[in-house]
From Swiss-Prot:
Highly phosphorylated. Belongs to the papillomaviridae L2 protein family. A motif (Nuclear localization signal) lies at residues 1-9, 497-504. Disulfide bonds join 18-24. Keywords: Capsid protein, Cytoplasmic inwards viral transport, Disulfide bond, DNA-binding, Host endosome, Host Golgi apparatus, Host nucleus, Host-virus interaction, Late protein, Microtubular inwards viral transport, Phosphoprotein, Viral penetration into host nucleus, Virion, Virus entry into host cell. InterPro entries: Late_L2. It comes from Human papillomavirus type 63. Signal peptide: none annotated. Interacts with major capsid protein L1. Interacts with E2; this interaction inhibits E2 transcriptional activity but not the DNA replication function E2. Interacts with host GADD45GIP1. Interacts with host HSPA8; this interaction is required for L2 nuclear translocation. Interacts with host importins KPNB2 and KPNB3. Forms a complex with importin alpha2-beta1 heterodimers via interaction with the importin alpha2 adapter. Interacts with host DYNLT1; this interaction is essential for virus intracellular transport during entry. This is Minor capsid protein L2.
Length: 504
């Protein structure tokens, strides 16, 4: 049988693993560590001769560091490598046209040769020297006189030019007035800054009207709060209802009215009653192949029922919630698929009760009114019934308890006609009495003969018992005595027709 030889891995892949275990094949170890026969010859021979840079060894020939150099060629070529492109030399001088083209257009009517004149170029240097004037002429202050006119003397010399700089800093507490007037005829410019604290400052910001915080008269009278929704009010805001159970996209909302949902929720899922704690979750392990109806149809296919959660309903009542998981579909792999249902039940509500009117005990006016209603539109009203007042203590006979004998009158009970004069009256909405007719049917005479029997008629009076002579024919005499008022009767069995019995 021929076997295909599997190719061994490369020596570079085998050597790192076998070196650790110290079980490398000799050929691989000598090749990697360069201890073959050829490597040893080169190592020993290099002691006497120089073979530097040739790359002679057990590896593949690469021509050394600089490659093989063919005879008669100065360039070195590496075997198996790419050719090195030759970079051209950079030109020293720029290559381009040296003739200058004319810019202006030529006149066709002019001569063919235009002689150009050389214009000498001259450079004019302009130097501006400023000589400041040390002595400033004094201008006398003019005086005014009513009889003489004002004369302004203007000097012939022009004033020297000066550079004036100004730095202004705004301060809202002061108002700064800066003025600089340079007019002709003045020897110098004046820059006057006036700072006056009497002038009003600049308004900065926005004018906001103030709010009047006067709340008016405060009442010191206390108010009685009667609209309490909880027995212990809290200042913190209470969450109305948990939002995680009321998402109709993920949970089915199922209201529950059975009281067992509070104390024994397991009885709604299965017919058994296992022992459990109220505050823990319930897990119902049942085979899905066995179709069993739950006591409550809302809890069918339930396999998990969480612990109770208390919250506040939107109408203010306390709500008990449980989260259930159904196992409606079961796959072959045992995975169950079902929806999640939110079962909730509103327990109670705390509202303000109306005041209860108390009745006075121990007093009776002798007049009683009884009211009731069979429907909202047909009330039943009872007329006033006058009850006789109770007899006074003087009407009773005082009997000594020490006496041994009592009369019969003391043992008789007194009959009090209480309620004998009551009248029941049914009236409609408008108050008109409604008369109800009770039909009374008289008794009809009974059908058929009454006291039917055998009568013996004798035309003559006879004394004693009559004599009856029996006949020879022995005929049974059947007497049917009818004494009923309904007219029904029963036949004697001898008068009924006999049935033929067929035996098979």
């Amino acid at each position: 049988m021929l076997r295909v030889r599997k190719r061994r891995a490369a020596p570079q892949d085998i050597y790192p693993a076998c070196k650790v275990a110290n079980n490398c094949p000799p050929d691989i170890q000598n090749k990697i560590e360069q201890t073959t026969v050829a490597d040893k010859i080169l190592q020993y021979g290099s002691l006497g001769i120089f073979l530097g840079g040739l790359g002679i060894g057990t590896g593949k020939g690469g021509g050394g560091r600089y490659g093989y150099t063919p005879l008669g060629d100065s360039g070195a070529v590496r075997v198996g490598g790419r050719s090195t492109p030759v970079r051209p030399t950079v030109p020293v001088e720029t290559v381009g046209p040296r003739d200058i083209l004319p810019i202006d257009s030529l006149d066709p009517l002019g001569p063919s040769v235009i002689e150009l004149e050389d214009i000498p170029a001259t450079t004019v240097e302009v130097v501006a020297e400023v000589h400041p004037i040390s002595d400033t002429p004094q201008i006398p202050a003019p005086t005014t006189d009513e009889s003489s006119s004002a004369v302004l003397h203007i000097p012939q010399e022009s004033p020297a030019a000066r550079t004036i700089t100004r730095s202004q800093y705004n301060n809202p507490l002061f108002r700064i007035t800066a003025s600089a007037d340079i007019a002709s005829g003045e020897a110098s410019a004046s820059d006057n800054i006036f700072i006056d604290v009497d002038t009003p400052g600049q308004i900065v910001g926005q004018e906001i009207p103030l709010v009047n915080f006067d709340m008016g008269p405060i009442s010191t009278e206390g108010e009685l709060e009667t609209e309490f929704t909880t027995s212990t009010p809290r200042t913190t805001q209470v969450q109305e209802r948990p939002t995680r159970f009321y998402n109709r996209r993920y949970y089915e909302q199922v209201p529950v009215t059975a009281p067992e949902f509070i104390t024994r929720p397991a009885s709604l899922v299965t017919f058994e009653n296992p022992a459990f704690e109220r505050s823990v979750s319930l897990i119902f392990e049942q085979d899905l192949e066995d179709i069993l109806n739950a006591p409550d149809q809302d809890f069918r296919d339930i396999v998990y029922l969480s612990r109770p959660t208390y919250s506040r309903a939107p109408d203010g009542r306390m709500r008990l919630s449980r989260l259930g998981r159904r196992a409606t579909i079961s796959t072959r792999s045992g995975v169950t698929i079902g929806a999640q249902s939110h079962f909730y039940m509103d327990i109670s509500s705390i509202s303000s009760n109306d005041g209860i009117e108390l009745q006075t005990l121990g007093e009776a006016s002798g007049e009683t009114v009884v009211q009731s209603s069979l429907a909202a539109s047909d009330p039943i009203e009872a007329e006033h019934s006058f009850i006789e007042p109770a007899p006074s203590i003087d009407s009773y006979d005082i009997v000594s308890l020490q006496s041994e004998t009592y009369s019969d009158e003391h043992l008789l009970d007194m009959y009090e006609p209480v309620g004998s004069s009551l009248q029941l009256q049914i009236s409609d909405v408008r108050g008109r009495p409604t008369v109800i007719d009770i039909p009374f049917r008289p008794r009809r005479p009974p059908l058929g003969p009454i006291n039917a029997g055998v009568d013996i008629y004798s035309p003559t009076a006879s004394v004693g018992s009559p004599t009856i002579n029996p006949t020879d024919l022995d005929i049974p005499l059947i007497i049917i005595h009818l004494d009923n008022s309904t007219g029904d009767y029963d036949l004697h069995p001898s008068l009924r027709k006999r049935r033929k019995l067929v035996h098979i």
